[in-house]
Amino acid sequence: LTSPTLAARLLDVIEHDILPLTARGVSLGNKVFGAAILRKSDLSLVVAETNNELENPLWHGEVHTLKRFYELGEKPNTKELIFLSTHEPCTMCMSAITWAGFDNFYSFFSHEDSRDAFAIPHDLKILKEVFGLEPGGYRRNNAFWNSYFIADLVEGEDDPLKTTLKAQTARIKAAYDDLSTSYQSSKSGNDIPLN
């Protein structure tokens, strides 16, 4: 999907739906990762969630979002949905998205951002140690799904929308930077296995 409103809508969902949940989660000691599921037809929000590893180390943002999605009564078919991840999914989350039948996912931050800007290198370490892959070494477009970076969608927009979306991107990055600082200062007190 490359509708001219897609980049704007995904950024709005991150800023207004996922970030508040993540701020609450980080205040409890969870990591900064979140996700949401939207309808392709009208870009309406189905569910948004955030990391909840203090409850269960498998409740990464994406997997916790899938858990909440499957707890809904009536659910759309996953082929009719967009999967939005604040951070490029780790291998567990990519597999969960695949097993759930999604044909896409969109990410705001990359694995390299998780390592460099958030001091959480585990995604890249697992890709290297378990699968022998360098950063970006997995197939971002494959028989199961196509993945996209929101920054690429923003770059494809025309001004003045592009300028507006870049300003929103900067605001979101600043908010995540603050949340990351908060998480990093408190993580020694949690019992998350790969904190």
Each model region followed by its residue ranges:
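Short beta-strand scaffold segments in enzyme catalytic cores
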Residues: 33-40
